[in-house]
Amino acid sequence: MPRGSAERSLSFLVSIAFFGLAPTIPLLAIALWHVSWFDGHGDEQMGADSDDRAHAFQSDAAHRSDLIARM
């Protein structure tokens, strides 16, 4: 059964979208994991009090701004 022109076009666009975006999904997952790791890293494990958390937050913010500046 021959496929219509619109069906072929739609199929082509879907395949382009899937194969074009599929490689970015792992990169997005890694980026989200990296950001979430910096946001909450160590607070629960170290039993940090509020001063330690404030210092850790400032250190993480400085580290992030340094990474952004390098880009």
Swiss-Prot record:
Keywords: Membrane, Plasmid, Transmembrane, Transmembrane helix. The chain crosses the membrane at residues 12-32. It comes from the Bacteria. It is found in: Membrane. It is a single-pass membrane protein. GO terms for cellular component: membrane. This is Uncharacterized protein y4uG. It comes from Sinorhizobium fredii (strain NBRC 101917 / NGR234). The lineage of its organism: Bacteria, Pseudomonadati, Pseudomonadota, Alphaproteobacteria, Hyphomicrobiales.
